[in-house]
């Protein structure tokens, strides 16, 4: 099971069930549409639609793109960001679906976000490039508690300390790092699979701030879940845990078998000694 937490001041939430959605399609998490709007058939609408088409067409090539369409006052700024652990086909499917739905759900809204479990798409009448943004945030997390929950937050924090310095524009997928580690503790062992990702328009300092914010969001809102996926406007944090079965005890660790003495054998009662001569015959 999963639960979703969202924070969206200055935005209202618009939810649409996709009647055509199948299991192979990306999972829609939430859509946020701004209150301010534009008029139908305006230059802003034309630029918005061109922007969304541009994002859709480019998503088969890269995991991230930002774009600017049109002249002031009708300029539209937009971007998409796909999770780095999915392939370009899945990225393209997600962005194309998101672009259609954001235009449908936020028909005349000047600003909008749409979050899927594999990507996010947004557009705005105000430039947002190179800036850290904390809202809106979406968190999907497991209702199961993390293994060794008393120590898990520290374990995850330490893992972030290790991964964040490795976020770099020179990686195969820019600003994306993933890791798998086996954690062994007295309470038991588990595999911790982690991924962090920043929008490439962020500098390293703002990337670190964004990832720390994402971690703080899940650790304060949701207890100690065994898995979580956090989307912010500029970064993604995901982790999962897989508990390992307890190993069977080795023979050397089994308690020794205590020797037991066998009960004494019981002998049959002693027979009377044999007669020295046969008894006389009976008289008739």
UniProtKB/Swiss-Prot annotation:
Subcellular localization, as worded in the UniProt entry: Secreted
Keyword Repeat tagged: yes
Keyword Signal belongs to the record: yes
Signal sequence interval, chain numbering: 1-24
Keywords assigned by UniProt, alphabetized: Repeat, Secreted, Signal
Predominant place of localization: secreted
Record region (Disordered): 247-284
Domain Gnk2-homologous: 26-128, 134-244
Organism domain of life: Eukaryota
GO cellular component: extracellular region
InterPro entries referenced in this protein's UniProt entry, alphabetically: GNK2, GNK2_sf
Family, per entry: Belongs to the cysteine-rich repeat secretory protein family.
Name of the protein in question: Putative cysteine-rich repeat secretory protein 7
